[in-house]
Amino acid sequence: MRVLVIRHHDVDTAGFIAEAFEARGASLDVHLFPDDGPLPGFGGVDHIVVMGSVSSVNDPDPWIAEELAWVRAVDRAGVPVLGICFGAQIICAALGGRVEAMGGNEIGWFTVDSADEDAVPAGPWLEFHEDRCLLPAAATVLARNDAAVQAFRIGRHFAVQFHPEVDGPQLKRWLDSMGAAAVQSAGLDPDQFLADTIREEPAARARADRLVATALAIRDS
């Protein structure tokens, strides 16, 4: 199985999601967009993972328009996508939905109300966003909470608003490079947030593995 990972920041990795795909025999190709140049072709790709970004899908940057068009082309080709946070929002916007600002943020560890906890466990999940999806009619909600739709499927695609990939080192890179002020604005202590994330790692790894199983089941359904 060949998996293409699209990331948007050099401090990001696919973390627990990459581990779960690799445990199933996948080889991962990683492309940093837009820094590494145009989005790659997807011939011979079995699954795509689109990761998060500090940007909003609604920002006027040319690369976002390019990525929206690319996701539409991926959809027409029938290649399944797993979207994470910004990746979920770009699937939503590319396929007929909208993305709106929440008027605040959701940062920290939160549970979700899941339609099927075998497919999408209740969590807790690490959240780090200030936009949310308004889904197209073709989408099916798989989990939500008071802040946002937290997981959905549309066709062969599966998307989550939270960050199942994040471990302690990943969060530390975020806090060091771009995230400490946002965490404080949410009323959290960055050091405690990091400690909570490290403590949660074993359970978070298992939940991420469950999500990859769900993504593959949706792909094959």
Predicted regions and their residues:
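Cofactor-binding loop segments of dinucleotide-utilizing enzymes, especially the Rossmann-like FAD-
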Residues: 6-8, 33, 86
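Short glycine-rich anion-binding loops that position phosphate/pyrophosphate groups of nucleotides
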Residues: 53-56, 87, 165
